[in-house]
Curated annotation (Swiss-Prot):
Heterodimer of HisH and HisF. One of its GO terms (cellular component) is cytoplasm. The active site is at C77, H169, E171. Transmembrane segments: none annotated. It comes from Staphylococcus aureus (strain Mu50 / ATCC 700699). It is found in: Cytoplasm. Gene3D superfamilies: 3.40.50.880. GO terms for biological process: L-histidine biosynthetic process. This is Imidazole glycerol phosphate synthase subunit HisH.
Length: 192
């Protein structure tokens, strides 16, 4: 079972619909009882990092997620950023599952990074356009599986142990986005 974590700030209905379209059983919850039963946990998100972490802590989801670190966790957009240690957006601590700091995009192009952009990767399936909406980015590191070029290299997919972060919106990226979401659910992008 796949559980989408509901902390009040997210693109939950679109993500749920996309996962159902792929044929998976999916439940939306913010309770330990349900999240503890998940095989895969999806952390969606749209909004401000500090506000999201405040809600996650208010709902005790940080503790619930911390006791489920043996499970695959997929963060989408803000959800990916929340898995990192810290963000400059609101100078807030994150969940700390992936090492690094989230920082504002530094580019001569307009911010937010909004619209379709091509993925760059050594992975054979990660080479098409996907839909981005964000002003902050993860650091370039050995955990980056794919990135987009937007006046600077912007991490688009990261994988660290059982954590997968997707900065763009696969649920808004058409059939190709759904293929990426399926690959993330099935095992990720390392050692294919």
């Amino acid at each position: 079972m796949i559980v989408i974590v509901d902390y009040g700030l997210g693109n939950i209905s679109n993500v749920k619909r996309a996962i159902e379209h792929l044929g998976y059983e999916v439940v939306v919850s913010n309770t330990s009882k349900i999240i503890d039963q998940a095989e895969t946990i999806i952390l969606p998100g749209v909004g401000h990092f500090k506000d999201a972490m405040s809600e996650i802590k208010r709902l005790n989801l940080n503790a619930i997620l911390a006791k489920n670190t043996d499970k695959k966790m997929i963060g989408i957009c803000l959800g990916m950023q929340l898995m990192y240690e810290h963000s400059d957006e609101g100078d807030a601590s994150g969940l700390g599952f992936i090492p690094g700091n989230i920082s504002r995009i530094q580019t001569e192009y307009p911010v937010p990074h909004l619209g379709w952009n091509n993925l760059v990767s050594k992975h054979p399936m990660l080479n098409q356009d996907v839909y981005f909406v964000h002003s902050y980015q993860a650091p370039m590191s050995e955990n980056v599986i794919a990135y987009a070029q937007y006046g600077a290299d912007i991490p688009a997919i990261v994988q660290f142990n059982n954590y997968i972060g997707i900065q763009f919106h696969p649920e808004k990226s058409g059939t190709y986005g759904l293929q990426i979401l399926r690959q993330a659910i099935q095992g990720g992008f390392i050692n294919d």
